[in-house]
């Protein structure tokens, strides 16, 4: 795959930021923080654009809560202005990266989803005697930041875009992972390694797929 470059102009384009703001407020339009942002929408977006251009953008703190159904999960809600940035980034990187996905990647992809995955599974099940069902325990809390960044650098060469991705990843709040490491896992010492992406971010829904696909391709 040819690495993606020159993504930054699309990300910081004002029209893309407007589009991202509309995407981020879907289903949340009348919440106080969204109303406050939209009251001075142009000024807020221009400020975001300036911060991105000058590399002074810093993600804000997360609001966290826990859900228990179907199992206990820590949900992290980013500030609204950060969600606008997430959409602006994904508008630029998702379409080209999506084209590199294998056909059986169904999560968070337009035109795919659970129904298509189920249909595909039924086809496999009818032609096979054995089925392996498995899950990755604590997947989001266990995602290694350094490994994720290294994989993304195989796919993206635009330095400005990588700066923003790193900023978002580094801004992740603690996810309460169990801190397990394996023999030979010596990229960094356990104390220095940072792991975990917040469940709730748009970027957290898409970026981990790159790890899954890379693992399959390896």
Regions found by a protein language model. Give the residues of each.
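Non-catalytic, polymerase-adjacent accessory regions of viral genome-replication enzymes
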Residues: 1-46
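Generic hydrophobic/packing signal
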Residues: 52, 56, 69-71, 81, ...
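Short, compositionally biased low-complexity segments
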Residues: 11-26, 59-64, 91-96, 126
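Short, conserved non-catalytic motifs in the polymerase core
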Residues: 27-35, 60-87, 100-112, 172-209
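Active-site-proximal segment of RNA-dependent polymerases
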Residues: 7, 90-144
């Amino acid at each position: 795959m040819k690495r993606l470059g020159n993504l930054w102009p699309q990300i910081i384009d004002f029209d893309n930021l407007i589009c991202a703001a509309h995407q981020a407020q879907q289903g949340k339009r009348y919440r106080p923080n969204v109303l406050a942002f939209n009251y001075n929408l142009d000024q807020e977006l221009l400020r975001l654009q300036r911060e991105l251009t000058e590399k002074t953008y810093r993600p804000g703190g997360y609001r966290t809560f826990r859900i228990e159904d179907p199992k206990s999960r820590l949900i992290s809600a980013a500030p609204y202005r950060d969600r606008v940035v997430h959409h602006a980034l994904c508008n630029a990187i998702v379409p080209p990266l999506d084209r590199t996905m294998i056909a059986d990647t169904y999560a968070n992809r337009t035109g795919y989803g659970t129904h298509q995955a189920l249909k595909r599974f039924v086809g496999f099940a009818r032609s096979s005697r054995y089925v392996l069902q498995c899950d990755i325990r604590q997947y989001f809390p266990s995602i290694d930041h350094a490994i994720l960044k290294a994989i993304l650098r195989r796919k993206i060469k635009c330095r400005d875009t990588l700066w923003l991705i790193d900023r978002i990843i580094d801004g992740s709040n603690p996810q309460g992972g169990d801190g397990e490491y394996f023999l030979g896992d010596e990229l960094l010492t356990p104390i220095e390694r940072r792991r975990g992406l917040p469940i709730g971010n748009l970027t957290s829904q898409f970026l981990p797929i790159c790890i899954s696909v890379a693992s399959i391709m390896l």
